[in-house]
């Protein structure tokens, strides 16, 4: 999806709305197909279809306006917005008491494009206290607003960074980053067979491994957890 959204933006930068519309149509058909595969009841299929129609109508609106980096960031945010809504609907249909909390209302950067941790802490705790009692809380990764209230992104670390910021803001006991291997290993499993996970690392050691290429974790993800202890 992200590649398609980047492609849409590229077409619009090149003043080719027809090319952008073609990709938007392809992406909409893809997601409408997912609706048929994912949901069992017509009620939730229809609810999700209506949501998707609204989002893709919004995407098409960018083919008729002047296109800048601001619009590009809004378009790139749609992947997270669509996927988290679909997952939340799936959980609700399955009888799981889940709620979607909007990252664009909780995650903000300051004028230096760094996470505004005071704001993030205040908003995350507010939304959690206002919505207590749910089994599962879902939010978007990577996307945020900047100091001027515009849709933006965290630039580095992606969704992992968002998870660490929220975990630190809520003073969580544990932050889990799910990937294709179980933790940081004693060697790079892409090149060495039979590697073993390292059971315990200091923040500085984890940050150094990430900095020197441990793909499991972006170096910036260490800082929020270290800051909150």
Residue ranges and their predicted role:
Residues 1-222:
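Nucleotide/pyrophosphate-binding catalytic subdomain
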Residues 225:
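Acidic-aromatic/histidine active-site loop/patch
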């Amino acid at each position: 999806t992200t590649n398609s959204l980047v492609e849409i933006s590229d077409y619009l930068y090149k003043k080719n709305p027809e090319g952008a519309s073609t990709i938007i149509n392809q992406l909409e058909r893809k997601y409408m197909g997912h609706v048929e595969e994912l949901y069992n009841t017509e009620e939730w299929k229809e609810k999700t279809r209506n949501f998707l129609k609204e989002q893709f109508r919004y995407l098409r609106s960018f083919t008729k306006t002047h296109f800048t980096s601001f619009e590009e960031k809004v378009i790139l945010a749609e992947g997270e917005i669509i996927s988290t809504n679909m997952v939340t609907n799936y959980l609700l249909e399955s009888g799981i008491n889940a709620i979607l909390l909007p990252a664009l209302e909780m995650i903000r950067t300051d004028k230096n494009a760094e996470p505004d941790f005071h704001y993030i802490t205040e908003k995350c705790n507010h939304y959690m206290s206002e919505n207590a009692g749910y089994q599962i809380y879902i939010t978007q990764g990577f996307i945020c607003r900047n100091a001027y209230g515009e849709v933006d992104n965290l630039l580095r670390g992606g969704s992992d960074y968002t998870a660490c910021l929220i975990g630190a803001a809520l003073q969580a006991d544990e932050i889990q980053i799910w990937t294709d291997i179980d933790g940081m290993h004693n060697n790079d499993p892409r090149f060495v067979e039979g590697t073993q996970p390292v059971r315990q690392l200091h923040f500085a050691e984890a940050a150094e491994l990430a900095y020197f290429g441990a793909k499991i974790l972006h170096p910036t993800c260490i800082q929020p957890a270290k800051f909150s202890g």
